[in-house]
């Protein structure tokens, strides 16, 4: 018997790159930003619980913006779609006020429709998930489908979302029929099948963001933010 187990799937009709001139999208974006124009937006979509490390995301954002000139710092924003205060997590507005009262932190705590969630991914320049023991990472998978790059831990299914190269070829969903799992170090270390290379540290380019990734300022911001996250680890 050949069994295949698919734990999660993302509907490409729901999460996808959209036209930034779409009237509903523009209205949603303007309401979220309250009329402010940001040049770089970091997006966090997770529960406010200890394992998801929302406080660390706030600290990483502060560490990142501390490295920027004031005029660039004012154009950066962190959007957190989560319950701002949760007994299982922390009081995020209080943390933000204590750590970075002068920075742009936007909380999105209301329940949203699927199309509105897709708007958030399209608004963002990057989506971050640094949760510990993350099994799959639905939010970052949705982000990639929407064409927005991700910053993640090398853990669980999130590393698969960044891509692996085997014998010079990026693995596809079809390849996993014989790969099964990439998370067994002994299986892939010093084997005769070829070298398995993790490509996430080089940066994947999801569909729809090619032009953005070619912009010098965007690439600089990505590098600085990733450095800030690593600095906290």
Give, region by region, the residue ranges found by the protein language model.
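Glycosyltransferase donor-sugar binding loop
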Residues: 72-92, 110
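A short helix/loop element that forms part of the nucleotide-sugar donor recognition site in Leloir-type
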Residues: 16-35
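Nucleotide-activated donor-binding/catalytic signature segment of Leloir-type glycosyltransferases, i.e.
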Residues: 89-115
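Short alpha-helical donor nucleotide-sugar binding micro-motif in glycosyltransferases
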Residues: 118-124
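Short hydrophobic beta-strand element within catalytic cores of glycosyltransferases
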Residues: 149-152, 169-174
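Carbohydrate-associated surface elements
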Residues: 9
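Aromatic "clamp/platform" in nucleotide-sugar-dependent glycosyltransferases that forms part
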Residues: 132
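Conserved donor-binding/catalytic core segment of Leloir-type glycosyltransferases
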Residues: 34-52, 58-61, 78
